[in-house]
Amino acid sequence: MDIVIPFVESDDDAWLDVFLKAKNLHPKNEKARQIFFVPFRRRYSSHGLFKYWWRALEQNYKSLTKVHLLLMQPSQFPSFLRKDDPRIVAHYHNEFIPDKHRPCFNSSTIELCAIKELDLKGNFILSNDDMYVNAPVDDSCFEQDGKPLAFFESRDAYGVFNQFRKTLTNGHKLVMDHYAKPLPYYHWHHLFQVYNAEFCKAFLNDEWDRISKGLGKWRRDHDYNHMMLMMAQNVAGMSVHSDKFPHKGYFEMPLFTVEQYSNADSFQVVCFNDTDGKHTDLTRKYLSSKYPSKCSFEV
């Protein structure tokens, strides 16, 4: 199965130039340049951990076909990766995001445009760079009888507590309107999501006039995100609920303790959601001890 993953690395000077210009910030020297970027660094840094994503992937997911790497521009291609590896397909934003939404720093816009425009076929996995295949898996963990697997658990309404919940609410309403029927609220799982390319492309094309109004360069309250595709697949009978789908390995790092790293070994897919970077050293220690050797993706 293919994996689609957006990636950004703020240590790339060329990318940072684009970012500061898009923010209408014009530092006069390098010191000012770095100071201007301080409030944004935590969201746009990989904290130097991305190589472990690839090492874990190769060690634990033997049936991988390709990785579709979504990048703003060529300077963002990770220096540790082999550019000639046929399993790595780099897609730059100008290939799939409309001009009016570029430069794009909105992951929802990036993901939805990629799913709609790229030459994806069959079922694929959507990942983030903080999600690791941490124990052996194969395609049977992610699909059954040709349909994507998912874990559905009802919850109360998403509400508008924060921007992410607002985008979930937007997608929930769109899917209800599309199918003209009530739709339960589902727990979201910030881990791998499995989508069927043909179904998702058809759904996005049908609703693109409405969805496109929620696209933009930056995150906004009226965005839509890819989770609406999970909802739509379920309503349409295109996905299969399964307890074996890897959905439990999410770790909210501000609430995480050192002792809990050992728990990560028991999950096939884990997410270390550490956007403020406070646990970077501990996460690196864990990952480097588990995946110390270079993989064949690396130079």
What kind of region is each of these model predictions?
Residues 10-42, 151-152:
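A solvent-exposed, charged loop/short amphipathic helix patch at secondary-structure junctions
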Residues 11-15, 75-80, 132-136, 141-144, ...:
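Short catalytic/ligand-binding loop motif for oxyanion handling, primarily in non-cytosolic enzymes
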Residues 41, 45, 76-120:
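Active-site-proximal specificity loops/subdomain of glycosyltransferases
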Residues 56-64:
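Short, acidic, metal-binding catalytic loop of nucleotide-sugar glycosyltransferases
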Residues 121-134:
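Short beta-strand-to-loop acidic/aromatic patch adjacent to the donor-nucleotide binding site
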Residues 135-164:
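Conserved donor-nucleotide/metal-binding helix-loop-beta segment in metal-dependent transferases, i.e.
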Residues 163-266:
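Catalytic core and acceptor-binding pocket of nucleotide-sugar-dependent glycosyltransferases
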Residues 249-299:
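Extended C-terminal regions of large enzymes
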